[in-house]
Amino acid sequence: MLEILMSLTAAICWAFNGIAYRKGVKDVSAFTANFHRTLFATVYFLPLALRDFPGVVIDLQTALVLVISAMLSFYIGDLSYFASLKRSPVSIALPASSTYPVYVVLLSTVIYGAELSLNALISAILVFVAVYIIYGSGEKGETSGLFYALLAAFSWALAILTLDFLTDRLPVSIVAFVRLLLCLILLSFTAKKDELSTEIRLFFRSVRGIFLLLGIMLFITAIKVSSSWNVVQPSSTSPVFAAIFGAIFLKERISFRLVAGIFVIILAILLLLLPPLQ
């Protein structure tokens, strides 16, 4: 129960992150905005990492998995998602990329030998359905847009599965800080140099970093307490919360699609709390 709540709270934090982006830093590219957000989050994580670092030993295998995890999540995954958005509308890119919980549940049986839970699998599918209900509008885009969205989902799924391995060997703060630091280095090559010195509202940059820190900390802790395939579903509901917060804070229209999507998300979360289906 606790890990489900932590994962759900992480999704809420990431949704607020999106609202902060749309409210205060949307005048720069997504790459530069992510660079600023990651920079602040890395700085925020530094004291926690320094506190937990004494006595920590990172062997070669763990270091390699850390690098792979950061590249899959923040570089290959995010870049593929942005490539998808360039080639197809949000109504295609977002639902397709939201299939990553399904991959996590299925791949966990191969990578970790986990038992396939019907509750977890159906819950993951329901999350995808909810995102599709809200954002899917039947618009058409390039086939490559769909491919990049699915590639992003697959990359994110693999990155999430590495967290089970990493949290067994390292404190949560170290895992989060090192991954963010590696991400920051990678983003420094893709952020637009002429935008790095652009005057953006400092408040919104710092707020995005705070929400990123809270979301990552809660999600990785949830994985450490349980396992990725049991907690990934609530964390992937951030697009639904983003739509809700958009209606509340940005005065966006509340549609029947949004209400229906919320109902499906509630079913998905309840399914994780029910006894296992046979």
Curated annotation (Swiss-Prot):
<keyword id="KW-1133">Transmembrane helix</keyword>
<dbReference type="Pfam" id="PF00892">
    <property type="entry name" value="EamA"/>
</dbReference>
<feature type="domain" description="EamA 2">
    <location>
        <begin position="154"/>
        <end position="274"/>
    </location>
</feature>
<keyword id="KW-0813">Transport</keyword>
<keyword id="KW-0677">Repeat</keyword>
<feature type="transmembrane region" description="Helical">
    <location>
        <begin position="56"/>
        <end position="76"/>
    </location>
</feature>
<comment type="similarity">
    <text>Belongs to the EamA transporter family.</text>
</comment>
<dbReference type="GO" id="GO:0005886">
    <property type="term" value="C:plasma membrane"/>
</dbReference>
<protein>
    <recommendedName>
        <fullName>Uncharacterized transporter AF_1533</fullName>
    </recommendedName>
</protein>
<feature type="transmembrane region" description="Helical">
    <location>
        <begin position="170"/>
        <end position="190"/>
    </location>
</feature>
<feature type="transmembrane region" description="Helical">
    <location>
        <begin position="1"/>
        <end position="21"/>
    </location>
</feature>
<keyword id="KW-0812">Transmembrane</keyword>
<feature type="transmembrane region" description="Helical">
    <location>
        <begin position="92"/>
        <end position="112"/>
    </location>
</feature>
<feature type="transmembrane region" description="Helical">
    <location>
        <begin position="146"/>
        <end position="166"/>
    </location>
</feature>
<feature type="transmembrane region" description="Helical">
    <location>
        <begin position="116"/>
        <end position="136"/>
    </location>
</feature>
<feature type="transmembrane region" description="Helical">
    <location>
        <begin position="209"/>
        <end position="229"/>
    </location>
</feature>
<feature type="transmembrane region" description="Helical">
    <location>
        <begin position="258"/>
        <end position="278"/>
    </location>
</feature>
<dbReference type="InterPro" id="IPR000620">
    <property type="entry name" value="EamA_dom"/>
</dbReference>
<keyword id="KW-0472">Membrane</keyword>
<keyword id="KW-1003">Cell membrane</keyword>
<feature type="transmembrane region" description="Helical">
    <location>
        <begin position="30"/>
        <end position="50"/>
    </location>
</feature>
<feature type="transmembrane region" description="Helical">
    <location>
        <begin position="230"/>
        <end position="250"/>
    </location>
</feature>
<feature type="domain" description="EamA 1">
    <location>
        <begin position="12"/>
        <end position="136"/>
    </location>
</feature>
